[in-house]
Amino acid sequence: MEFFTYMATKYKGVSNVIYEIWNEPSYKDHINQIDYTWAEIKEYSETVIAAIRAIEKDAVIIVGTPRWSQNVDDAANDPILGYDNLMYTLHFYAGTHKEWLRQKGDYAISKGLALFVTECGGMNADGQGPIDVESTEAWIEWMDENDISYAFWSISDKEETCSMLLPSAPSEGPWADTDLRP
């Protein structure tokens, strides 16, 4: 809790600070690929939320969900109660994640959860493959229809489809159009 207490104290009252308290809570056991359960994530999240709320009463706090922040339906069935300005994150990659994941989002919304897509991309979940334009457009339309904010991954210069910059781009900018991936 030391980190979140420090950050909440440092940024208290700064209206554009958003706390995402656990990015992609997945695989507590990487060898056997055993995911954290929603109950485990919820217990941790409630502790962190209480620490932040003790200092910062109104900031938006975003809670991750199992399976790389895809199982928002788990949170919808047992949401965190007693706090305002909570959101749950949903991550997708358009080449891999299709209508079935939007249906999980629809279910969470129908149960009253606020969603924020804090990571997404137009390619496959591994960051590679071609941009799936049709699926990306379907996701953007769905997010717009549901007033969901989103952030595409990633502003980096790695040699992968999801990187917006070419490996030759200066790491600290400024960037020209010739530094951007086509």
Specify the residue positions occupied by each region the protein language model found.
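Extracellular glycoside hydrolase catalytic/binding regions
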Residues: E2-I18, W22-S149, W153-D157, C162-P182
